[in-house]
Amino acid sequence: MTTQMEDVEEKVINEEYKIWKRHTPFLYDMVITHALEWPSLTVAWLPVKTSQPNKPYSIEKVILGTHTSDEEQNYLMVAKVHLPVDEASIESLKYDDTKGEVGGIGNVSEKIEIIQKINHEGEVNRARVMPQNHSIIATKTVSSEVYIFDTTKHPLEPTPDGKCSPNLKLTGHKKEGYGISWNPRKEGHLLSCSDDQSICMWDISAASKSDSTLDALNIYNGHTSIVEDVAWHYIHDTFFGSVGDDKKLMIWDTRTGTKPIHVVEAHNSEVNCLSFNPFCEFLVATGSTDKTVALWDMRNLGNRLHSLISHTDEVFQVQFSPHNETVLASCGSDRRVNVWDLSRIGEEQNNEDAADGPPELLFIHGGHTSKISDFSWNPNDPWSIASVAEDNILQIWQMAENIYNDREDDLENSKVTNAQIGE
């Protein structure tokens, strides 16, 4: 019986994917699909962009990891991405089955290329780049340690012995975890959370060149279950937030000790992720196993501002756009990345539109056929997103401009089409 149900589900997923491919020319200005050798649990853009004279593309980079079988070597990876520089360079908008893309850029054969592989001990649960130094990458590992890699001090090809040699190992946790966050305003300050119910903070600038390990500067305790995610505030350099399986959102201030300053039961189920708004200092979003994304005002955490409802399964990642104050995206087990525009909350809808989703649901990316593990807004190109899923696929995509620019007929038509994909 289970096998029959799985077969039916697989057929449904494949049919949805075919529908998505048919509609990509109307929904996207760009889609690039790249099959990785192994699934990546993490993806993050490097905030660097190189343009070349007389070339129809720019060169950007993303960091990835591997999640291999137990017998295979794991890697932290840096990939080079060729992105079209403007609409004039984009070929006719049709989905190319052989290349897996919309919006090609001429004769560039490899749009995505792995240019550096660094041996890693176990799978890379998450990898994030330091904002102040783009060669410094922190990784969450399958052990209790957090690794720091300086990519300039590692060869482009991994050493054949498979030895993992991070430039620094950060200690303090007792178990593995996923959440990790660099302080955008204090260089070297790193937060990590863990299944051991704790949050650790390090200042890696305190490590001498001879140090191979660094103990946590502070350990924060307040959660009563697994801490799933942690994030520094973008504006106030002593504030951070955390969420966990105890259903709690906690706000902390490093100046007041190691206990939270605000605690709220944020959802009816485990809380898996959070994101502070880079523009509005009081706005924070949380995503949960209860399938919703919640919006909160830090000045009044007793009352939820709004619930974003469209996902059909657990929400595992949420991120505000670095370019637009009212835009955020979320992803999860339903194989979808939803893009939301909070400025549209409360807009009037007819019954047909309301059946397709709330007015603030701007876009549904339906290009993956398995649970989406992570996504990342491109800091260099507004509306460009990279996403990775358990189907080994890395996709880099940008919704059609008429969807986010036009608030009337074009938006309505695009949203109806897109809603059909999400059915």
Swiss-Prot record:
Extent of the WD repeats: 119-159, 172-212, 222-262, 266-306, 310-350, 367-407
PROSITE patterns: WD_REPEATS_1 (PS00678), WD_REPEATS_2 (PS50082), WD_REPEATS_REGION (PS50294)
Organism of derivation: Dictyostelium discoideum (Social amoeba)
This protein's UniProt keywords: Chromatin regulator, DNA replication, Nucleus, Repeat, Repressor, Transcription, Transcription regulation, WD repeat
Highest taxon listed in the record's lineage: Eukaryota
Function: Core histone-binding subunit that may target chromatin assembly factors, chromatin remodeling factors and histone deacetylases to their histone substrates in a manner that is regulated by nucleosomal DNA. Component of several complexes which regulate chromatin metabolism.
PANTHER family given in the database record: WD40 REPEAT FAMILY
A biological-process GO annotation: response to mercury ion
Name the record gives this protein: Probable histone-binding protein rbbD
Cellular localization per UniProt: Nucleus
Entry GO terms, CC: nucleus
Assembly, per entry: Probably binds directly to helix 1 of the histone fold of histone H4, a region that is not accessible when H4 is in chromatin.
A GO molecular-function descriptor: histone binding
InterPro entries membership: G-protein_beta_WD-40_rep (IPR020472), Histone-bd_RBBP4-like_N (IPR022052), WD40/YVTN_repeat-like_dom_sf (IPR015943), WD40_repeat_CS (IPR019775), WD40_repeat_dom_sf (IPR036322), WD40_rpt (IPR001680), WD_repeat_RBAP46/RBAP48/MSI1 (IPR050459)
Family listed: Belongs to the WD repeat RBAP46/RBAP48/MSI1 family.
